[in-house]
UniProtKB/Swiss-Prot annotation:
Subcellular location: Plastid, Chloroplast thylakoid membrane
Organism: Chlamydomonas reinhardtii (Chlamydomonas smithii)
Keywords: Chloroplast, Membrane, Photosynthesis, Photosystem II, Plastid, Thylakoid, Transit peptide, Transmembrane, Transmembrane helix
Protein known as: Photosystem II protein PSBS1
Family indicated by similarity: Belongs to the ELIP/psbS family.
Annotated Gene Ontology cellular component terms: chloroplast thylakoid membrane; photosystem II
Transit peptide: 1-25
Function statement: Required for non-photochemical quenching (NPQ), a mechanism that converts and dissipates the harmful excess absorbed light energy into heat and protect the photosynthetic apparatus from photo-oxidative damage. Seems involved in the activation of NPQ, possibly by promoting conformational changes required for activation of LHCSR3-dependent quenching in the antenna of photosystem II (PSII).
Top-level division of the source organism's lineage: Eukaryota
Keyword Protease tagged: no
Major site of localization recorded for this protein: plastid
Amino acid sequence: MAMTLSTKAFAQRGVSARKNTVRVYAASTKVNPKLASKTEVERFKQATGLPAPAINGKQFPLKLGFTKTNELFVGRLAMVGFSASLIGEILTGKGALAQFGYETGLNGIEVDGLVIGLIAFNLIAAVLPTSQTFVPEEQDTISERPAGPLQDPRITLLEPKKFFGVQGFGFTKENELFVGRAAQLGFAFSLIGEAVTGKGALAQFDIETGLSLRDTEFGLVVFILFLLFAAINEGSGKFVDEESA
């Protein structure tokens, strides 16, 4: 009888000990979400020791990776850079590479080396297997995006909106992405053309069309103003990481 009572008491102690263990584990699991609920600004400051950049009093962290927000920023830089290089060519008669060499005092060979190094760095960063190319939120939305010409070969130039991924006229972020991509391609090909021919973007355009700068001046002014306005216009719409903020 005494053995039975001691066995029951031991079993009760084991049950209470397990309950205490469960309580401790539950308490520990409740603390973890607080650690995971840090904002992006706090993570940026913890990782770098620096406050996140701020625009108009609103802080935002810098995220590496091929996200739409980063591509929008790079596209804006390309539009501003392309416009500034065209204005510089009108004033000096020199292309972007020659202007860069004039400002820095570097010769053509050194400038070409810097440009090639920059291109190589971006290519390596883009294809490096260990680099994080997409944030999880961007990956989750890939399946929800409408198919483009790379996903569906039936989409051709006969359907320009689907082919270029735009929704019509207007300063939306989707349209600005397209304009930014066009500016990046145009700027890149103008630099390649200048490295091959020694002529800037405007001189290359004159060679291709046979028109002088005087004939194309009005269209050029409209093009430059459009790029500058598109670069500084905030537009409408949101991206994934902005909606989750």
